[in-house]
Design a protein with these regions (language model features):
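Short S/T/G/P-rich N-terminal loop/turn motif that feeds into the first structured element of a domain
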Residues: 1-66, 80-81, 103-142
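An amphipathic, aromatic/His-enriched active-site/gating alpha helix that lines ligand/cofactor pockets
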Residues: 76-104
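Ligand-binding pocket scaffold of soluble enzyme catalytic domains
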Residues: 70
Length: 142
């Protein structure tokens, strides 16, 4: 499945701050892929209506058992409200047992830099995965 292109649920004001999250999920087996994909599409639909969502993209690599998300938000609170709301909250709880690994990275930018690029997101995810493997967290994370 190709990446779902950057979607802009709500217009972002010019020159405004934006809070970014990128994630990488790897499921245990190929048997877990269809379920994860279906659930991730439900979460994707939720993003398109979430208050404060400036943009999002999903990149599914089913044969590698890996899924990437990239999103930009008005602020950290808007992202957290989305993550705590249904269906996202229930989906994450339901899929927890299928996860082999996950990586999350957060950073701030401006709306002038949207849409975000996958190259930048993957670079930051790789750096965070290396920190996680070494037992450290990103500066300012948490």
């Amino acid at each position: 499945m190709p990446a779902l292109p950057w979607t802009r649920p709500h217009p972002a004001p010019a020159h405004a701050p934006a809070f970014v999250m990128a994630s990488r999920f790897e499921v245990h087996s190929l048997r877990d892929v269809p379920r994860f994909l279906l659930k991730s599409l439900a979460a994707w639909r939720q993003v398109t209506a979430a208050p404060g969502a400036y943009g999002a993209s999903l990149d599914a690599r089913p044969f590698k058992r890996t899924f990437y998300t990239l999103s930009a938000w008005r602020d950290r609170d808007a992202l957290h409200a989305y993550a705590r709301a249904e269906p996202h909250r229930g989906i994450m709880k339901d899929l927890r047992s299928t996860m082999r690994a996950s990586t999350f990275v957060f950073w701030e930018t401006t709306t002038d830099d949207l849409p975000l690029t996958w190259d930048e997101a993957r670079r930051r995810l790789a750096e965070q995965a290396a920190r996680d493997a070494a037992g450290g967290a990103a500066p300012g994370r948490g």
